[in-house]
A protein has these predicted regions:
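Conserved beta-hairpin
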Residues: 60-75
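Conserved catalytic-core motifs of GNAT/GCN5-like acyltransferases
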Residues: 143, 156-175
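A short helix-loop-beta-strand connector motif used in the catalytic cores of GNAT acetyltransferases and
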Residues: 50-64, 80-85, 106
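Conserved GNAT-fold acetyl-CoA-binding loop/helix
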Residues: 29-51
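Conserved acetyl-CoA-binding loop-helix of GNAT-fold acetyltransferases
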Residues: 109-112, 118-131, 153-157
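Conserved GNAT acetyl-CoA-binding A-motif
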Residues: 105-107, 133-145
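Conserved N-terminal entry element of GNAT/NAT acetyltransferase domains
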Residues: 1-19, 23, 27, 31-32
Length: 179
């Protein structure tokens, strides 16, 4: 548990926190945003069920940021064993397999409540994740829709580097890594 500017960063540890993650996710899906918001603010793509979110959390806890006892940001930890349980992520895990990467944890999704953006929360979520999952894992791997310029820039700014990219339907995905 780390506290920075009255925001607490920690592992997700309750059903209530999981529910709050899902509620923040719903607010940031493309269907909930205008075109301008999507290009300026970014968006999340995958919708998780409570059950899968809970299973993922048990295998490797999600990282959350809390302010006033509310989840205001999250980074989902996804153990590679879940690679085939979320259909839309299967292609990413197939691509990672080709690279023969070992001992990595996938970051399944990151999201920050709109009023807490541009305050260093993104960087601190990943910092907390590294503290918790290293040395068990030696890198964090994720994918970003190449159209999601805001997310790509934010990941590059904290040290993510390109591994590979692939097309899935009409979307080009960049697979990136943080060591």
């Amino acid at each position: 548990v780390e506290q920075v500017d009255s925001i607490i960063y920690k592992s997700c540890s309750s059903d209530s926190e999981l529910q709050q993650i899902l509620s923040l996710q719903q607010k940031n899906l493309p269907s909930a945003l205008t075109e301008e918001e999507k290009s300026k603010e970014g968006f999340v793509t995958v919708v998780h069920t409570f059950e899968i979110l809970k299973k993922m959390n048990k295998a490797c806890p999600h990282i959350i940021a809390m302010a006033n006892d509310k989840v205001i940001a999250y980074a989902l930890s996804m153990h590679p064993k879940f690679g085939n349980q979320i259909e839309v992520l299967v292609p990413m895990f197939n691509e990672i397999e080709k690279l023969e990467l070992t001992d990595f944890i996938a970051m399944g999704q990151i999201c920050i409540d709109k009023q807490f953006r541009r305050k260093g929360v993104f960087r601190q979520l990943y910092q907390t994740m590294k503290t918790i999952v290293f040395p068990e894992f030696s890198s964090i791997v994720t994918e970003v829709d190449a159209e999601n310029k805001r997310s790509l820039a934010a990941h590059q700014a904290i040290g993510f580097t390109d591994l590979t990219g692939y097309w899935s339907g009409s979307t080009f995905w960049k697979i990136i890594q943080l060591k």
